A protein has these predicted regions:
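Amphipathic alpha-helical "stalk" segments
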Residues: 1-44
Length: 44
């Protein structure tokens, strides 16, 4: 397994241990999108 790093904002990262199941992969993708949306919303 290996870790992947996703930069959500300049000060926020999400680290994910791969591989994931298809279901968990979809949930992590949704989590990252929502985190980016929330942080973008608060920076305006």
């Amino acid at each position: 397994s290996q870790w992947e790093r996703y930069v959500v904002d300049e000060d926020v990262e999400i680290h994910v241990k791969r591989p994931l199941s298809h279901v968990k992969n979809r949930r992590v993708d949704a989590l990252i999108q929502e985190a980016r949306r929330l942080l973008k919303e608060t920076s305006q």
